[in-house]
Amino acid sequence: MTAPPPPPPPPMPSHWHCYRWTGERRTYDDESSRRPPHLVVQDISPQEWQQIAAASPAFMASEVPPLEVPHWLLRPARMIKATFEAPDKASAWYRDQVSDLSPSFLTDHDKNSARQADWFAAADDRLGWGGDIVGGWYLRGTGFASVQVVACSPNRIRPTIPCPMR
């Protein structure tokens, strides 16, 4: 008896939205504005996602990265720093952001060019199959920086979250 064929792979996203946040660590550590008001463990309709997001003005107004990466897509489009249809363009944006932030990284370990080359290779790979990229670094002083590239239309983790640009 033969095994059934594997399911088809999820569709590739039509584009990626890019987000960057830099701020105080204590702001980043306060999770109250980083999550929508209801824990959702399954996919729901696009309309239900919008209702959940609208029920939390603090979540919608916060530019601090959400706890779940696809939840960026629930926030207003004005928070998007860039949008790319091609994964290589989204990866180049990520590299540029990390390179810009690198002199401010707290640790020499994170400033290491070989380590960063590994991050960039992983980003290229992840975007190549339709995934998201998430990077976060402690900065000198009391800062924290986050750079995220989020697949959209659909996102693999939350395919029913609607695009914030529509």
PLM regions with names:
Residues 9, 14, 42, 85-86, ...:
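Intrinsically disordered, low-complexity regions enriched in Ser/Pro/Gly/Gln/His and often acidic
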